[in-house]
């Protein structure tokens, strides 16, 4: 019996010591993403009430349906970025035909009401430029379907809203 205890003790000790390897510190890291060279082209199509610059590796596509319905005006577009499997949905509304406060409230609802439960943080960043346009950029953290949304307006005639979506499952750590 005494011999069995000694053999068992030696076996367990050998097992524990043989499986131990020196700890190697691993730095936190992220995937290296090679971004293409920054080159832009101008979207300035006749009949559209807005213009902007977008990357040369992206495509602007007219958006003609909204959840199976016809869009309320012909100025809704999508900016597709195939190399990143992403799309920016752009909707445009005329302030004169819509209540300005209602447009602002809807933009905030699209960010906060739909994402508050799953977002780990929502960071609103004011936007101002020299063309009398202002708005808000929202950076959303966590398991949200979209990480970036924004709206721009001149508060009298134009209201433009956008949201960026990636064709991928959202992961909290990405």
PLM regions: where:
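Second-shell loop/turn segments in exported
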Residues: 88-97, 149, 173-174
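N-terminal targeting sequences that direct proteins away from the cytosol to non-cytosolic compartments
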Residues: 2, 19-77, 82-84, 101-102, ...
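Soluble periplasmic/extracytoplasmic beta-strand elements of cell-envelope proteins
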Residues: 78, 89, 161-165
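Sec-dependent bacterial lipoprotein signal peptides
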Residues: 1-21
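Residues at beta-strand starts and edge strands
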Residues: 9-10, 48, 73-75, 84-86, ...
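N-terminal segment of the mature soluble domain
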Residues: 79-90, 102-104, 108-113
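Signature of long, low-cysteine stretches enriched in small and polar/charged residues
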Residues: 105-161
């Amino acid at each position: 019996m005494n011999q069995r205890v000694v053999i068992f003790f030696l076996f367990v000790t050998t097992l524990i010591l043989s499986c131990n390897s020196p700890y190697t510190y691993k730095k936190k890291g992220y995937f290296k993403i090679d971004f293409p060279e920054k080159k832009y082209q101008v979207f300035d199509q006749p009949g559209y009430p807005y213009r902007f610059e977008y990357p040369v590796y992206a495509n602007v596509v007219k958006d003609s349906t909204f959840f199976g319905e016809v869009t309320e005006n012909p100025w809704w577009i999508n900016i597709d970025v195939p190399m990143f499997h992403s799309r920016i949905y752009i909707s445009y509304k005329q302030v004169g035909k819509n209540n300005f406060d209602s447009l602002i409230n809807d933009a905030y609802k699209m960010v906060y009401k739909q994402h508050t439960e799953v977002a780990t943080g929502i960071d609103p960043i004011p936007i101002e430029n020299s063309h009398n346009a202002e708005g808000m950029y929202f950076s959303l953290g966590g398991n949200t379907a979209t990480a970036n949304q924004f709206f721009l307006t001149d508060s009298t005639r134009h209201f433009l809203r956008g949201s960026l979506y990636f064709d991928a499952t959202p992961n909290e750590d990405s």
